Swiss-Prot record:
It comes from Homo sapiens (Human). Its main location: membrane. Cholesterol binds at F43, Y57, G266, K267, I268, R657. Keywords: Glycoprotein, Lipid-binding, Lysosome, Membrane, Transmembrane, Transmembrane helix. Changing C604A: In 4CA, abolished ability to regulate mTORC1. Changing L177W: Reduces binding to indole-3-acetic acid. Residues 1-370 are annotated as: PIN-like transporter. It is a multi-pass membrane protein. This is Lysosomal cholesterol signaling protein. It holds the Pfam family Mem_trans. The keyword Membrane applies. Changing C638A: In 4CA, abolished ability to regulate mTORC1. GO terms for cellular component: extracellular exosome; lysosomal membrane. Glycans are attached at N9, N15, N29, N309, N381.
Amino acid sequence: MNSNLPAENLTIAVNMTKTLPTAVTHGFNSTNDPPSMSITRLFPALLECFGIVLCGYIAGRANVITSTQAKGLGNFVSRFALPALLFKNMVVLNFSNVDWSFLYSILIAKASVFFIVCVLTLLVASPDSRFSKAGLFPIFATQSNDFALGYPIVEALYQTTYPEYLQYIYLVAPISLMMLNPIGFIFCEIQKWKDTQNASQNKIKIVGLGLLRVLQNPIVFMVFIGIAFNFILDRKVPVYVENFLDGLGNSFSGSALFYLGLTMVGKIKRLKKSAFVVLILLITAKLLVLPLLCREMVELLDKGDSVVNHTSLSNYAFLYGVFPVAPGVAIFATQFNMEVEIITSGMVISTFVSAPIMYVSAWLLTFPTMDPKPLAYAIQNVSFDISIVSLISLIWSLAILLLSKKYKQLPHMLTTNLLIAQSIVCAGMMIWNFVKEKNFVGQILVFVLLYSSLYSTYLWTGLLAISLFLLKKRERVQIPVGIIIISGWGIPALLVGVLLITGKHNGDSIDSAFFYGKEQMITTAVTLFCSILIAGISLMCMNQTAQAGSYEGFDQSQSHKVVEPGNTAFEESPAPVNEPELFTSSIPETSCCSCSMGNGELHCPSIEPIANTSTSEPVIPSFEKNNHCVSRCNSQSCILAQEEEQYLQSGDQQLTRHVLLCLLLIIGLFANLSSCLWWLFNQEPGRLYVELQFFCAVFNFGQGFISFGIFGLDKHLIILPFKRRLEFLWNNKDTAENRDSPVSEEIKMTCQQFIHYHRDLCIRNIVKERRCGAKTSAGTFCGCDLVSWLIEVGLASDRGEAVIYGDRLVQGGVIQHITNEYEFRDEYLFYRFLQKSPEQSPPAINANTLQQERYKEIEHSSPPSHSPKT
């Protein structure tokens, strides 16, 4: 597309200008043409959609709704709410107003992306999983979240200008489901046939299974039924049926977005080395290649009479292509049990990456011309607004790192520096907005602050990636933390200083990105290239270590490795077991943990060594001998308590979160580098370049959103305490009724069942003797071990429900944390069973007394033996 926009008036990151008068700022159109969309409603729509998604994610992370419970909501959304919504809209759809050229343009664009991804996957994928990838990856790249996320945004943009565009959502969505997805399903069925070597399954049966999966989809089924009733009922739904359908359909949007947030919990984990490149390529195909192809196909094939409508349709096609991946793709991957990690992780990443792209795209599509002044002021306003919100997010994220004391450990120490640099960038942008154009000294000072911190954010991406690589090899390589920190702040300051000394100030430009002209552009490009190169090489080299096959995930239930395994209680057993056995087998057993409190002083009862047992048989602690261990351990003297503290401070390195942070930042660095090179080698960049400018502005001053999403919602510091506070306030309403009952009936029944039917088996399976003093040991177990055991025996269907079950055992006095400082967690924290006969024990002086009384009440109120229930 030709453009009259002078290159010197464009920016690499943002146009820094004085505040524009209101009449101009709010009227970007340079002509009197009516706007093609209502941009003022876009931001509230995005906040509404992603706010509900965030609520669902928080509910899942706080275990308010477990993954098993979420399946019920998902079934309601997919089998009741969405089919009802589809049926009604297909019945009332006016097919005479449909632009069919638009539909087959979208079909051609989707089919092109589908077959490109499919062919490339077949060519480069490994033979053992070639067909599963060739089936699911093209579906990932073409199936959009049309109804839950797409429809509210299209409604906000086009409800007042082109309301007929809303009906295209219901017509475009079945294209993927009915025409493209069957091909992917057939490839997946071929992969299943190859894996099982079932010779009886012929080709016709494979194709039939693929088509059957399509027909079983409620969306496809209701589309056909709706079209049939469109002609039968003459596009009029009976009143009583309409009210019923409206009741179901109106519940779709909120529940679908909430369910989308629930499905994101714990999806990004154990990313393998091949997943990084695959994720970037798939997300690029979905969010960049597909929108461009959709737009170009509509431009090429749509032969509408109205030029305005033609342009609006092509813009709408581009916006449609930016919609993120549908959650249904993750469901397909789970059903086939193929490529689940890549598909689910990609769904989460694409959903959040699509938000700024949709915002930028919709904003740019409101400009009928390429007049540089409105574009400059638009970027200015967007950058200023984003900086304010981003700075608040960064302050919150920094507070989380400081309060959790993670800033003292690697790699969070370096992440803290990155967040500080991002905060200075936002503050610098806000200050620049108020600097007078003729105030040269003020401009120089703010320029130094802004660009030294902006270059620092670029470099910290590469430095953080190389620190992650060194962290994987820290047993052989000493991490030069001081050098990394000095480089992260010193090199950007040096570059800006060189620009100030040697560069020629461009007096005609009020834009900070062109303050020193071409020299500044080259400096920015070199900085970006070096950071991308360092980050890319470091992330690839991380896979050369022995444990590079997987990284620690978001889910705290995954196995953790402590920094120095040779000096900790968390030593891994050489046997190939799921969890490390910690100080098991022949250790002298004592009648009590050595760090028990007696009259305020530490004491150790007499040691009664036990006979050596075979290494093949675990030592089962004698709880009858441990009757006197009723006081909590002292964290200053107990080895187990000390190791817990070490684990909490340094064991959770959150490597996957940091790798994800680096990947998202690299995408933004690529965009900035492309913008630099595009400007340097093309004097008439065009509209696409301006969109890239907007994206760069959103990225540079909106990095705080990425950091907040990854580090701002700490589970144990924010979510769980907030959840417990709400539960406390809620339960206070019933205090008068429950004053005479130490524990609720639900907790009491859970504890009764566990004591009579499962306690002894659980002790034999997971409780081990672990050293807690110089010559003493205690029978304990890890919280994550109990969670896995509860799932194994059928007392819980997932880890979320198992945590709830374990928390009830703690409240009922059945188990207890060794120091009584933590609630039940799915982590490597040590817990112990309280003795069966608390009345035989001496009274405790501390908070354990209440738990012992609760346990005694449960034990004495337990019914006689019943048939076990699992």
